[in-house]
């Protein structure tokens, strides 16, 4: 049995087409979804991510505003800019591209964004609502992962999900989202002593650790759904995930590739959150 490849880029395109239709209908009502992205400094990776977000907005018809600051900006000035955007009715979503310079406290910046415009889903209020199963903006990568698993038509309820990784951005929240779908969730991390025993119990295995090709066939139960969140660059320049793709291909039931797996879904769910925010606000742009 060779695993079915879950092509995240194709799933993302399908969802973006749906978002485009929604945006057209909103514009007919005078509502134009708007996203503001704040970029601090000249980090090439951050700039690349921001370009992807701008391109996504253009594709589905979302108004986007890029606000750039030098790396020397003070925390006070950045907070003031967020305050301005919180009060701007044209803007439904605010995203601050991370990481920030060391002299700026990321926690303070994230918490300054209005929860009603927190389309990244990082604000503690958004996280609390997610934990308690309330309607909120879900963090983009975890949300995208759940949507990819749903593409397999697997009934998540009652399944055993094992998450390798416990970051606040992916590992912790993705486990919570699967718990909200009535799955049984196990977390593995650097201190887990019997990891392979646990991962072999997984109907769905999520790998988000940043270690190239760490997960091999002996980690898997036959037929498992494998979602590879890692993006690592080898010395050859080639990208690879945290899963040894070729090694597990004959054991997994479904698997996401790297690239064109989870990555395209992250920006797509950001666009989804921005459109949802515009719907909630119901603001007419003049």
From Swiss-Prot:
Reactions listed under catalytic activity: (6R)-5,10-methylene-5,6,7,8-tetrahydrofolate + NADP(+) = (6R)-5,10-methenyltetrahydrofolate + NADPH; (6R)-5,10-methenyltetrahydrofolate + H2O = (6R)-10-formyltetrahydrofolate + H(+)
Keyword vocabulary terms for this entry: Amino-acid biosynthesis, Histidine biosynthesis, Hydrolase, Methionine biosynthesis, Multifunctional enzyme, NADP, One-carbon metabolism, Oxidoreductase, Purine biosynthesis
Pathway assignment: One-carbon metabolism; tetrahydrofolate interconversion
GO function term, MF aspect, one: methylenetetrahydrofolate dehydrogenase (NADP+) activity
UniProt-annotated binding residues for NADP(+): 165-167, 190, 231
Gene Ontology biological process: L-histidine biosynthetic process; methionine biosynthetic process; purine nucleotide biosynthetic process; tetrahydrofolate interconversion
One Pfam family of this chain: THF_DHG_CYH_C
UniProt cross-references to InterPro entries, sorted A to Z: Aminoacid_DH-like_N_sf, NAD(P)-bd_dom_sf, THF_DH/CycHdrlase, THF_DH/CycHdrlase_cat_dom, THF_DH/CycHdrlase_CS, THF_DH/CycHdrlase_NAD-bd_dom
EC numbers for this chain: 1.5.1.5, 3.5.4.9
Gene Ontology annotations for the cellular component aspect, listed alphabetically: cytosol
Subunit annotation: Homodimer.
Free-text function comment from the UniProt entry: Catalyzes the oxidation of 5,10-methylenetetrahydrofolate to 5,10-methenyltetrahydrofolate and then the hydrolysis of 5,10-methenyltetrahydrofolate to 10-formyltetrahydrofolate.
HAMAP family: THF_DHG_CYH
Family, similarity comment: Belongs to the tetrahydrofolate dehydrogenase/cyclohydrolase family.
Protein name as it appears in the record: Bifunctional protein FolD
Organism (species): Bacillus cereus (strain ATCC 10987 / NRS 248)
């Amino acid at each position: 049995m060779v695993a079915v490849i879950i092509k995240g880029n194709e799933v993302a395109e399908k969802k973006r087409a749906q978002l485009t239709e929604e945006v057209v209908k909103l514009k007919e009502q005078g509502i134009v979804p708007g996203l503001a992205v704040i970029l601090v400094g000249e980090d090439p990776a951050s700039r690349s991510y921001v370009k992807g977000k701008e391109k996504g907005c253009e594709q589905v018809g979302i108004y986007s505003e890029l606000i750039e600051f030098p790396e020397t900006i003070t925390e006070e000035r950045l907070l003031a800019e967020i305050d301005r955007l919180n009060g701007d009715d044209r803007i439904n979503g605010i995203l601050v591209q991370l990481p920030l310079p060391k002299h700026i406290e990321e926690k303070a910046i994230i918490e300054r964004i209005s929860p009603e415009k927190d389309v990244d889903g990082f604000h503690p209020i958004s996280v609390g609502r997610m934990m308690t199963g309330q309607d909120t903006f879900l963090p983009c990568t975890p949300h995208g992962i759940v949507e990819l698993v749903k593409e397999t038509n697997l009934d998540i309820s009652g399944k055993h999900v094992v998450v390798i990784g416990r970051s606040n951005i992916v590992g912790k929240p993705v486990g919570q989202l699967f718990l909200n779908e009535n799955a049984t969730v196990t977390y593995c991390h650097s201190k887990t002593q019997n990891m392979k025993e646990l991962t072999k119990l997984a109907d769905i295995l999520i790998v988000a650790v940043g270690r190239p090709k760490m997960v091999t066939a002996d980690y898997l139960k036959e037929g498992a759904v494998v979602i590879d969140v890692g993006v690592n660059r080898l010395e050859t320049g080639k990208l690879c995930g945290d899963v040894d793709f070729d090694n597990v291909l004959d054991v997994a039931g479904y698997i996401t590739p790297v690239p064109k797996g989870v990555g395209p879904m992250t920006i797509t769910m950001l666009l989804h959150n921005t459109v949802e925010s515009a719907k909630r606000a119901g603001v007419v742009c003049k």
